Amino acid sequence: MSNRDNESMLRTTSSDKAIASQRDKRKSEVLIAAQSLDNEIRSVKNLKRLSIGSMDLLIDPELDIKFGGESSGRRSWSGTTSSSASMPSDTTTVNNTRYSDPTPLENLHGRGNSGIESSNKTKQGNYLGIKKGVHSPSRKLNANVLKKNLLWVPANQHPNVKPDNFLELVQDTLQNIQLSDNGEDNDGNSNENNDIEDNGEDKESQSYENKENNTINLNRGLSRHGNASLIRRPSTLRRSYTEFDDNEDDDNKGDSASETVNKVEERISKIKERPVSLRDITEELTKISNSAGLTDNDAITLARTLSMAGSYSDKKDQPQPEGHYDEGDIGFSTSQANTLDDGEFASNMPINNTMTWPERSSLRRSRFNTYRIRSQEQEKEVEQSVDEMKNDDEERLKLTKNTIKVEIDPHKSPFRQQDEDSENMSSPGSIGDFQDIYNHYRQSSGEWEQEMGIEKEAEEVPVKVRNDTVEQDLELREGTTDMVKPSATDDNKETKRHRRRNGWTWLNNKMSREDDNEENQGDDENEENVDSQRMELDNSKKHYISLFNGGEKTEVSNKEEMNNSSTSTATSQTRQKIEKTFANLFRRKPHHKHDASSSPSSSPSSSPSIPNNDAVHVRVRKSKKLGNKSGREPVEPIVLRNRPRPHRHHHSRHGSQKISVKTLKDSQPQQQIPLQPQLEGAIEIEKKEESDSESLPQLQPAVSVSSTKSNSRDREEEEAKKKNKKRSNTTEISNQQHSKHVQKENTDEQKAQLQAPAQEQVQTSVPVQASAPVQNSAPVQTSAPVEASAQTQAPAAPPLKHTSILPPRKLTFADVKKPDKPNSPVQFTDSAFGFPLPLLTVSTVIMFDHRLPINVERAIYRLSHLKLSNSKRGLREQVLLSNFMYAYLNLVNHTLYMEQVAHDKEQQQQQQQQP
């Protein structure tokens, strides 16, 4: 025995030295890591609380907390493990063998344990001192408090103590049973050490055999034999689940319990002093990540995510690392401290989230409400002005109440409808804040409303002034006024929408002025003077008014003919007068249409076309905007606009569908109306237009893009101006004659219809293009050369011709034509999408060879849109993205072209087979 005692003393002294040196290492290396990881463990719990599928809904929160290695176990990380000092830590060490790595220090721990059991005094003196040094001095375990915690809870303690420890005990026993096979491994420890440990641990086992059915004995065997074996040591980063187990040993055997407590404290102190390997930490982190639902995450990424979330818990957890809870009242304070933390993050954090989100959304809504309030006030002002106009005219319009409803209500409706929609979208009951965000852009701000209100007043008041002149024209037009009303309302909607979205107030004013000028066609000379004055005021627009008036006039005359044919000429003059006066109210917006259409080539039908020019007006408006942007206003682009534009307008959100369809049909008769001897100057232009239209393929491009820099364009514009002046002169004469002789319009319509069929054939293909994008691609490429020649685009013409030659087959690299000059400006071609595309590139050819499912291609294209929306993206990346997107659009465009050609071939074959 004396030899054994001496050996044990030597071992203890050597182990003390090793422990002291290791303690320093621990403080320097592991303590920092353990403390940081302790914060991260707490953050894991917080993440679990905040996770989408909150674990509390699926698992018992007490079990979840402990099973995550948090509540009591994480305190050990801070270096102040209180509960681990209790005897069942043997079981925990066994449990944790799964997570830790074998180290040579385990032999030291085993020897220390044997020495402890041999002499309680040396064990108590040295190891208690070690424990106090390693662990915080305040950490004195109170056996009286600990002994009551495992399976029964006194009334004075928190009720969560029992479920916490008991559930953890159950989990540990199950896990230890699974690990029992590994417990048989031999460490290479001397039998003496094992015997000594057996003696000391038999005392411990006596108290536990009753409760745990020798599971703890198995655990002890694991811990004992695992000292020098490959069985991994318990991770010092986690405290045992059954930390309070040995308290009940104290009830039965006070001496043995004190020995076991001291022994456990000593063993834990040694474990704590052992430097923690990275593998220990990583395994612990993986375990935590698995329990937190963050599976398959390596320790580094997990630690990063936890450090991100650490801001939540650092303020409250750091000043009191969970080890401090342990210090005197482990039973009560630990459970309650955990419940406090859990309560904060499980309840308060979600509540705070639910509170903060409504606050933010309510702030947003209040912001929208302010806008809505402003817009409503503006609406009221606008409506008041409209009501005044109505009151002035109601006396005249008693006979036409229906028309008043049709016109006045839609006149107001654009504001109301959009505002109501925005209110519904941004109402507090809106589904999400995304809706509110986008509604913010949809809604009209007070500034927009002010602009619209000012424009409304500016438009409507002068209409009254010109009632006399308009009446002169309207008396001669019986049925046209009926068409004017819906068109006027449509124009109001369109103009308002244009203003609301584009905010081009100057353009709207200009067009309204042009409308006034064209409306009063009886006084065309006076109107021209006014136009000249306004054109002087608007220098930027002066360049385009004559051209667009010409183009509009042709369309308006067409519509007038339609109106004459559609409307009954037998209506009484009194009703005509009333309708005239009423139309004057809303003609302000239709005015451009009337003027543009009546003054040009269709002088005979220009006066009736005033009412029906809504769609034409919208088209003219679009063409003007395009002209202002691109600077191109040749005669032929106008003609092209007159034809396909009505159909595009038919699909566009601005125009009335019926009117636009009619204009499609009538636009060519209108354009041929000037074939009368009166309009010889306009005949030449229309012949040109007819030739162009005949040369066009069946499907015309939705948009014709041309360079604004070409000199030929300027020449055409000058010629168009001259011809438009001739038109205006001839149309004035013709307008007067037609105002006197309304019947001529019918004859003109008949002539135009007789002459129209060739052009109508071309136009019938235009609606097909607008309606079916699949058919567009073919005409796009075939029609590109035609437009290039028509518009004489110097830079864009050659590429357009080239693209038009592309065959309806799978593209190859030979089809790609590189520009002659390295940095020449981008050349565009018309596409089936309604907007121009750059020329074919190698990327498109490659995409043909590697086609993806269409849903994948669409998803990639949408993603590229999202990426482009990132303002922080570099310029090069933006260019690459846009190049890819254009290449994809070229791919789709050409495939549509191929499909259309194949479809045409099938139809031809069917036609051939039928006869």
UniProtKB/Swiss-Prot annotation:
Main location: cytoplasm
Summary of the function given for this chain in its UniProt record: Has a role in establishing cell polarity. Together with cAMP-dependent protein kinase regulatory subunit BCY1, provides a negative feedback control on the cell wall integrity-signaling pathway by acting as a negative regulator of MAP kinase SLT2/MPK1. In heat-stressed cells appears to play a role in localizing BCY1 to the cytoplasm. Seems to interact with, and down-regulate, CDC42. Also acts as a suppressor of PKC1. May act as an integration point for distinct signaling pathways helping to maintain a balance among these different pathways.
Record PTM Phosphoserine, positions in chain: 229
Miscellaneous comment text of the record: 'ZDS' means 'zillion different screens' as both ZDS1 and ZDS2 have been found by a wide variety of genetic screens. Present with 279 molecules/cell in log phase SD medium.
Region feature (Disordered): 1-28, 69-134, 179-261, 310-330, 412-433, 464-807
Name of the protein: Protein ZDS1
Keywords: Cell wall biogenesis/degradation, Cytoplasm, mRNA transport, Phosphoprotein, Transport
Family: To yeast ZDS2/MCS1.
Entry annotated with the keyword Transport: yes
Source organism: Saccharomyces cerevisiae (strain ATCC 204508 / S288c)
Biased composition (Basic and acidic residues): 202-212, 313-327, 464-480, 531-541, 552-562, 711-721, 742-751
One biological process term in Gene Ontology: positive regulation of G2/M transition of mitotic cell cycle
Acidic residues compositional bias, start-end: 243-252, 515-530
Compositionally biased tracts (Low complexity): 74-93, 565-574, 597-609, 668-679
Biased composition (Basic residues): 618-627, 642-656
InterPro entries: Zds1/2 (IPR040206), ZDS1_C (IPR013941)
Record flagged with keyword DNA repair: no
